[in-house]
């Protein structure tokens, strides 16, 4: 009886594992950006050029998706070299001590068809806090070049600098507390 139970458990675990698909973002067709307000009168946009995101899901509508994101903070780019160098310094991202920023999803809930609230833990500047973002699943299509399935996603949300003790010296008049996150990603099957 014990052997049958162990075999049944192994079979169920294998079935569940094979039912899940892992997807990885295509760096050439993915973007992770942000907007922050400078002096409360002008928006500054930037991107991270080096990031990796995986999704694990078993449902075709991704309603059970789990996201894992790792961002290389040294890859920040605002199209102004002087500002980018300052943003990498201890005044802001402190990339020498915090070379990565991460997000691990903890839950996903449907808002409407293909629109979800994605919750998870964001680690920025050594501080981990729960955040919730809006996620849109934009569909899956067979890529005419690779002949493999690609899935598209769009994500938006707002985080607060103060929640992560990020650049407190900037105060609330130099930089807005709210940072808008905008991401678009094209993901291909990894398995």
Language-model-detected regions and their locations in the chain:
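Positively charged n-region of N-terminal signal peptides that target proteins for export
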Residues: 1-4
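Alpha-helical transmembrane segments and their juxtamembrane interfaces
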Residues: 12-13, 187
């Amino acid at each position: 009886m014990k052997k049958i139970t162990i075999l049944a458990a192994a079979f169920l675990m294998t079935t569940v594992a094979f039912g899940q698909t892992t997807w990885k973002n295509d760096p050439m067709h993915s973007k992770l950006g942000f907007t922050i307000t400078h002096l409360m009168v002008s928006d500054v946009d930037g991107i991270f050029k080096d990031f990796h995101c995986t999704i694990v899901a078993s449902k075709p509508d991704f309603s059970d998706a789990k996201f894992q994101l790792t961002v290389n903070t040294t890859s920040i780019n605002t199209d102004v070299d002087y500002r980018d160098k300052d943003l990498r310094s201890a005044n802001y991202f402190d990339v020498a001590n915090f070379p990565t920023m991460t997000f691990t999803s903890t839950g996903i809930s449907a808002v409407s068809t293909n629109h979800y609230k994605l919750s998870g833990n964001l680690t920025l500047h050594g501080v981990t806090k729960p955040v919730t973002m809006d996620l849109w699943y934009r569909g899956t299509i067979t890529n005419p070049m690779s002949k493999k399935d690609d899935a598209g996603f769009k994500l938006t949300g707002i985080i607060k600098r103060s929640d992560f003790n990020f650049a407190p010296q900037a105060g609330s008049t130099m930089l807005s507390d709210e940072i808008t996150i905008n991401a678009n990603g094209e993901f291909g099957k990894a398995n």
